Regions:
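Short secondary-structure junction motifs
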Residues: 36, 48, 72-74, 91, ...
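Glycine-centered coil/turn sites that cap beta-strands in beta-rich domains
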Residues: 11-29, 33-54, 63-66, 76-79, ...
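Short, surface-exposed loop/turn motifs with a glycine/proline- and acidic-biased composition
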Residues: 65-101
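C-terminal tail/sorting-segment detector
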Residues: 1-3, 10-14, 87-113
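Terminal low-complexity, poorly structured segments
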Residues: 6, 39, 61-63, 105
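Residue-level detection of beta-strand scaffold positions
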Residues: 53-55, 111-112
Length: 113
């Protein structure tokens, strides 16, 4: 074993853990709405996400953001109150769900004719 007298620096690196809580899904505005509403969401890292509208029975009404890759950032999407067939939905309560990986966030909105 030979001693060279050289030293090396050890560094501690911060590890950033991203949790589902770091993903933000804001309350839509306006709410109640007619004819359109805006939904804002924030991604802390690049993610594959989708946003879907459901009725109170849990049936899919519309997909307002098909599955896609998005870089980190804050985004807005609008829903015009139309179902996936292009028909105006009935007045009432609906839920919008953002899916990212194995996680979901859901909020409630109200459409009024």
């Amino acid at each position: 074993v030979e001693w060279t007298g050289a030293s090396s620096d050890l560094a501690v690196k911060d590890v950033v853990l991203i949790t589902p809580e770091d993903y933000k899904l804001s309350q839509n505005y306006p709410n109640p709405f007619n004819p359109t509403t805006t939904i804002e969401y924030t991604l802390p890292i690049a993610s594959q996400i989708t946003i879907t509208i459901y009725n109170v029975m849990g049936q899919e009404v519309a997909t307002i953001l098909p599955l896609q890759d998005k870089p980190a950032g804050t985004y807005r999407v609008q829903w015009n109150g139309l179902d996936k067939s292009g028909n105006r939905v009935a007045s009432g309560t609906y839920f919008y769900t953002m899916r990212f990986g194995n996680f979901t966030k859901t909020k409630q909105l109200t459409f009024m004719k």
